[in-house]
Design a protein with these regions (language model features):
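General beta-strand structural signal in soluble alpha/beta enzymes
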Residues: 23-25, 42-45, 118-122, 160-161, ...
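Glycine-rich anion-binding loops of enzyme active sites
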Residues: 11, 48, 82-168
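Extreme N-terminal cap/leader segments of soluble proteins
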Residues: 1-60, 79, 88, 103, ...
Length: 294
């Protein structure tokens, strides 16, 4: 029966590529990275839990691994930074074997390979509980200042990068983080704030407004609705726009800008009043997206 050290040795073989920034790769107590003196280090962490973010009875382990890495990459996109390295932890149920752990890792690695950065370390344990995974990601600004959520200004336009709603039908596992799109937007110098839509448009817009001390006037008729929201609405008897506003896990970017943008969908304006209203008068904009109960 294979154990932890067999798995670690296998991971070392999977991460054997040479990277000029990695001075000490997986296998030691800590990874050692060389960091450019003129670059910012940007750090984020995210976790996924069986029964909350995925269902291990339904979703393949490689898809689960890909999702936990992509959630972190979506946070990189939200701040327009480039991923540079990651470390991961896996708390594996004792009912799962080393082959399952390998598939989880290969999913994480596949997501990292898309954006050409290494997994440089981590930790694995087994326990009598459901699968839990955590990834900590290290990002770099690479010449572009990070875009935050607290710098929206009255008069800014509000945009999203893609259609929303119904992600639970599958896109919450297969989404592609908008890292490249975020860099393109940031290079324009016109984006004033940004966030990824993980908790739902209504709640994530509220985050921007609260942190920036502003409000918003949305036009519900302009919000792009994904076909999945239409499909889901026939199952839930809710309007597609409700799914677009509140479902979450779309992982599109929600951003504000001081000028018209050729990329994305315009959905409203930032206002001085600290409230969020629907200018079309058709929907309630009370935040109903995801929030963990502590």
């Amino acid at each position: 029966m294979a154990g932890e050290f067999d798995f670690i040795e296998w991971v070392r073989r999977q991460t054997a590529r040479r990277d000029e920034h990695v001075l000490v790769p997986p296998g030691d107590d800590l990874a050692v990275l060389k960091w450019p003196a003129d670059d910012l280090l940007i750090v984020g962490v995210d976790q996924v839990l069986d029964g909350v973010h995925f269902d291990s009875a339904v979703h393949a382990p490689r898809d689960i691994g890909r999702k936990v890495m992509n959630r972190n990459l979506s946070d990189c996109a939200a701040m327009a930074c480039l991923p540079a390295a990651a470390v991961a932890t896996v708390a594996l149920p004792k009912t799962r074997d080393i082959e399952y752990a390998k598939e989880l890792f290969l999913g994480m690695k596949a997501a990292a390979d898309v954006f050409d950065f290494p997994i440089v370390g981590g930790d694995t344990a087994s326990w009598d509980a459901p699968l839990a995974m955590t990834v900590t990601i290290l990002g770099r600004s690479s010449g572009i200042p990070p875009i935050t959520r607290n710098t929206a200004k009255p008069g800014d336009s509000i945009y999203v990068t893609g259609p929303l709603g119904g992600s639970i039908l599958g896109r919450h596992m297969t989404f592609i983080p908008r890292v490249r799109e975020a860099r393109q937007l940031a290079q324009s110098g016109l984006v004033t704030s940004m966030i990824d839509i993980s908790d739902g448009l209504s709640r994530d817009l509220r985050h921007i407004c609260r942190e920036s001390g502003v409000g918003a006037a949305l036009h519900s008729s302009e919000i792009p609705i994904h076909p999945d929201a239409d499909t889901l609405s026939r199952q839930t008897c809710r309007y597609p726009i409700e799914h677009a506003l509140h479902d979450g896990e779309d992982y599109e970017l929600l951003f504000t800008t001081s000028a018209e943008q050729p990329y994305g969908y315009w959905i409203g304006m930032i206002t001085a009043e600290t409230s969020i209203i629907d200018e079309d008068g058709a929907i309630s904009l009370e935040p109903k997206g995801w929030e963990h109960k502590l």
